[in-house]
């Protein structure tokens, strides 16, 4: 069984800011997307690192979960997704850690999924999914041409219980411990995917996504890029660090 960090999902009432930031500024290229009950989603990939998924409500009773999220928090990071090869074995690992998954749905042979509530997952929803095949949908017309290529090379997540969070991401979600001490731990997955866990007390639900980092493989981000990215990221409830040579 393998578990791989696949994407960071962001809930938003409008997709334009996300397309401009992650596509136009940060060079994300369309992968796929489509309709799910109550919401539409689309994913962009980068030169390395996890994908970004944008989610927006599509109306109807099934949209209530995302509408509530946006009403409470506004546009902001919604979940981490991990793709697994054996979801039942992953669920057994999760339960062995004393965590009970929620919204477990194994009925669809093409997409089996379960979630960890933020109270159990150190401040953010975690989705684990077993996927068979990928939907092929044309890129949205409003998606800009990708900007210069960038690497999505870090997610920093602050947690109150560093030891417990490290166990979850390492023992259940197959993160390889790259470094760690009493204050922080870095875990990696294939494809240049890196989560840094940093201890911080007093966080709601025991954790909070602090920032993400993108690095240009060739050349530095311009002052205009940084200003534009900062404005767009703020609208998405996200802090983006731009790095370069």
Question: Model-derived features: where do they sit?
Answer:
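Anionic group-transfer/hydrolysis microenvironments
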Residues: 9, 55, 81, 119, ...
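Generic hydrophobic/packing signal
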Residues: 58, 81-84, 95-98
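Short, flexible helix-coil linker/hinge segments at the edges of structured domains or between repeats
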Residues: 58-69, 132-142
């Amino acid at each position: 069984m393998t578990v791989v960090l696949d994407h960071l999902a962001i809930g938003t009432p409008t997709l334009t800011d996300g397309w401009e930031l992650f596509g136009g500024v940060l060079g994300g290229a369309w992968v796929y997307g489509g309709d799910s009950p109550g919401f539409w989603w689309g994913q962009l990939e980068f030169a390395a690192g996890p994908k970004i998924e944008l989610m927006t409500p599509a109306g109807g009773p099934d949209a209530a979960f995302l509408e509530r999220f946006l009403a409470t928090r506004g546009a902001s990071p919604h979940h981490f997704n991990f793709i697994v090869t054996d979801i039942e074995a992953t669920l057994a690992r999760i339960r062995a850690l004393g965590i009970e998954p929620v919204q477990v749905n194994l009925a669809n042979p093409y997409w089996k999924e379960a979630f960890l509530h933020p109270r159990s997952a150190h401040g953010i929803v975690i989705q684990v999914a077993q996927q068979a095949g990928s939907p092929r949908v044309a890129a949205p017309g409003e998606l800009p041409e990708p900007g210069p290529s960038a690497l999505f090379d870090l997610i920093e997540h602050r947690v109150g219980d560093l030891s417990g969070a490290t166990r979850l991401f390492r023992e259940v979600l197959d993160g390889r411990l790259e470094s760690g001490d009493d204050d922080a731990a870095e875990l990696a997955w294939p494809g240049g995917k890196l989560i840094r866990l940093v201890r911080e007390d007093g966080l709601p639900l025991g954790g909070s996504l602090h920032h993400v980092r993108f690095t240009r493989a060739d050349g530095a981000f311009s002052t205009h890029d940084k200003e534009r990215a900062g404005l767009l990221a703020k609208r998405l409830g996200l802090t983006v660090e731009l790095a370069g040579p």
